[in-house]
Amino acid sequence: MINLVIDFNNIAMRAMYACIYMRESGVTNYDTPEECGILARKITTDIAFILHMFGPDRVIFVCDSKHPWREQLYESIPGMEYKGNRVKDEEKNWNNIFNTMNDLKDIYDKKGFITCEIEHAEADDLAALYKDALYNKRGENVVLVSSDRDWCQLIDFNTDKSNFCLVYNPIANNKGKKKIYLTEQCSEWLNAPEITNIFFNNYSKEKETIRTVSKDPKNEIEVLLPEQILTDKIVCGDDGDNVPGFYEFYQNGKKVRFTELRMKKLFEAAGITDLNGFKEKCIAGSINDYIAKLFKREINDMDSNERLMRQRRLVELNPVLFPVEETNTFASKYEPEMETTKGRITGVTSIKMEDILKDTDYVTEGYERKPRENAIFKNFDTKLLDKFVSNPLF
């Protein structure tokens, strides 16, 4: 069984900019219902493409909520704001954009998909909670869909049960490749020959699906070490989210902080081989001495154990670190859905944008695509236009 967990806001923002960059679409700032309609159809077309690619058994959309709980952690970090380095383009009609996104979430939910949103939670948190509920507790396969590299710390593989959790990045890199991130053990399992008897008892449909997706010339597998990704973020921080490093200071008006090279030197000097070793030094308080030697300055104002916990809560996608209100809401409202047919689309071979948005303001009876929309949908048309069939789910 494959569960597809989609970063809705990530997909929506990508589609929003794509519509503007394609000049033929005529989209400018989303001031009109027509432009918002184009956005809704673009988002849904992108999602339909991903569903067609993986043929999942269950589809889940995880959504960001306002005022994420991590903002509060910055009250003790002078001069910094969570994701404060992101500048909003004031020319765009954000009210219309977010209203369109909210409308789509309601439509997807009514069409039978799962749309998960919890107050003060980010999609990252929800992805981690679904991984725990589906992969860890139920032994099911999970494909996380997002271009957010933070999600890569969630990739996993169970060698005993041969179930996986991997990440698919739907945004192509500068070589035109879309990445499939997985662990080394998962890669070895995928490449191992299938040994079956005449009854195909050992045949894995999920394995064959990922193999097929990876063979697409537009996709590319990349093997990652999830612990290394997390270690880098805890020690070095994350400029993309405006996350500070474990230790940093200003010298001659310039910020000095950990880089990967400095982290490597610190670990070598302290005899640290992995993240657990770093945690042990932080809890014992001895890491400060090694950091002081590395940066050639005294450190008297940092509790390394408290700093470790701050960094972990900022970047680590571990439900144990989330607010209890968030995990309780998930456990009571969303986890029970795993026992129902909610979000299940088993047996559906393909889904068309027109199917999902049928009988809404975005696809009314007699809908025909307008010429101005052809440019933003053309990449999908060549592969999907003749392959979609009527979907019995809708």
What feature does the model see in each segment?
Residues I2-V145, W151-E184, E316, F322-Y334, ...:
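Noncatalytic, basic helical substrate-engagement surface that gates or grips nucleic-acid strands
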Residues D7, D148, L275-K279:
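A short amphipathic alpha-helix within small helical-bundle interaction modules
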Residues F49-C63, P78-K92, F113-I114, D132, ...:
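Non-catalytic nucleic-acid-binding/docking modules located in mid-to-C-terminal regions
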